[in-house]
Amino acid sequence: MIKNMKKSRILILSIIGIIVISLGILSWNKPDKKAGEDVTKYDYVASFYSIHQNGKMNPQTKIVFASSDQEQLEFSDKVYTAGRLFQEGNTVLAYSFSGNKSLLFESTSGYSTFSMAEGVFESTIYTVKLALNGTNGRIEVINIDDGSVGEIRDMIRYTSPDHKVTTSPVIHSSIYRAVEIGTRIYFVGYDMVQDQYELSYLDEETNELHYVDNWHYTSVNFEEFLYVDGKIVTVENPYNSRFMKNITLPETASLTSMDPDTLESKSVSLDTKRIISAYAYNDHIRLVTVDNHLLEYTVDLELVSDKVLSGTDFANLFTNTDYKFHGIRYLGNRAAAIVTPNTETTTELGKILEFDADTLTLQKSITIPLSENTGWKTDFVDLLIIEK
């Protein structure tokens, strides 16, 4: 009986040993998953790209996640030059310059890299200038550099209604604003050959380009391009085209509202020479003028209010000589500006200035410190308000 007990004990210990060894082997073969929190815990993400530090060529990218409570997380990379930011669900992308690998942030633990699909374009030198979330997937505006001189070549890559990733025909315009409405992608861009700004749309069902000629005999620069309460809204500043010297052109800014289906439009001239910022708020259009007024219009172009901004922190964004203003982002009731020091510095990358989108009063100033003691001057910066 004692012998049987010993045999049973040995058998049990052997089984336990085999289980432990097996678990050890399984654990060794299984790669560790990086632990980390969701990047959407932060309120903002900013990218900073510098070609020189301390006066020497040393390209570097910095991606900084920041919250209104001053919590920050920084990533630096000297191999991949990336900057244009885009949010897709719970991930953040930093698109590369000139065909390098782009950066993908899925958690606070780090980032991975990815490349555009090979063989899609004639050239491997390309830059994603603009990205937006479409109905069927990501929409990307891509600039192609094939060595052509004096010619702009852009393309739009999107997912068609039949769920195929599609690349548009070549567009000889530098696209800088776009919006998807139904199965059309409307966009504005600059035609260098014609020296004019244009509004066009891409039909996703046929992959055909269509030019909207409302501005063919005018000379305007589209400061902003919005989709508000079912209408396309273009905010226009005067532009002196070299081909329109003998044509009398308006000297003030204007606002146009257009039906996206019929392309019927109406415009109103504004009592200001230039609009410096514009955004949608509660189905209205907000316009910030160069002479420090905040104008609010309906999509039917009726003036709702006119507020003076002179002397406010928001107005000072455009006149501050210590910092360079790089733009404003709007999302819901938040407006955020990004500024960087005008000269090389060893203390900070820049500041995120958080405003109330309704009143444009300053809520928070978030300083992003420079993490190493080196002379830094920003050559490119982008800011994204993270959507929760």
Predicted regions, residues:
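N-terminal "mature head" segments of proteins
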Residues: 2-135, 157, 375-379, 387-388
